[in-house]
From Swiss-Prot:
Belongs to the FKBP-type PPIase family. It comes from the Eukaryota. This is Peptidyl-prolyl cis-trans isomerase FKBP15-1. A motif (Prevents secretion from ER) lies at residues 150-153. It is an enzyme of class 5 (isomerase).
Amino acid sequence: MMSSASAMKAVGFLLLLTILTLAYAKKSGDVTELQIGVKYKPQKCDLQAHKGDKIKVHYRGKLTDGTVFDSSFERGDPIEFELGTGQVIPGWDQGLLGACVGEKRKLKIPSKLGYGDNGSPPKIPGGATLIFDTELVAVNGEPSSEAKSKNEL
């Protein structure tokens, strides 16, 4: 049987371990639910992304430590896919719904809506929270009215 002093030490140790674990999880930037931050939204929203739309998106993907693992901005070639049909990770299918053409969003995607426990080696480890800076370029081949007017000049 444990003495009350030993029990108090054990409880104190478990409490310290719990606090350190929570502090590390918070510090690491991991999230458990999808977080969508709108960084820029055009004044006029002519086109919004809906399930089944073919959309073009520029993106920069990072890990929580800031390591960039992919960037269409660097390549100058946005990705094109049908929204909401599983052609991309679930965090994108959910995180880009309702975005306006020209809108910039920051998506913090938990592992369960990204690449899961397996990751996408070698650049994305298993269980990784992903951070994407995105810009919706076009919906069904149509750019924003702002982009159209710039091209007409």
